[in-house]
Amino acid sequence: MNKHQRKSFSERAQMILHRVEDAILVGLLLTMIGMAVTQIFLRNLFEAGIVWSDVLVRILVLWVGLVGAMVASRQGNHITIDILDRYLPAHAKKVADFVVELFTALICTVVAYYSLVFVQMEFTDGGMAFAQVPNWLCEAIIPFAFTVIALRYFILSIISFKKIIESRP
């Protein structure tokens, strides 16, 4: 894109959302590393530590993993089996991409639904994770992340379907 062309509103919004996602991921990762390092120093230097630090670090691992999965799903950057790329003809590869993306979207939708049910149960239960932070709040990333991933893969499957239709003779 040359510098005289203007990006559309949706392209600018998408770019901003990607930057927000990246910033959240970096912030979570830095917080996780900072908390772990702080805990190590406190234990080794003062023989004391933050009581809820280990629990927070475990929760941050969950959040970093799921936000990282959201980031990876932007362009369909997931674990793939390269055998399809090597041996399938171009049209068959497009069909395989569509099937994989649609299947991924459906599975993520199911996981999002059942994780939402789980978070609702945790909300009803009222348990605390640490320092008066409720369990459900720590687990809320699960349905959110899988919903975002499902939506992205539904969009990717629509794009792949259009490519299949356009490439037909």
Regions found by a protein language model. Give the residues of each.
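Alpha-helical transmembrane segments and membrane-interface helix-loop junctions
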Residues: 1-169
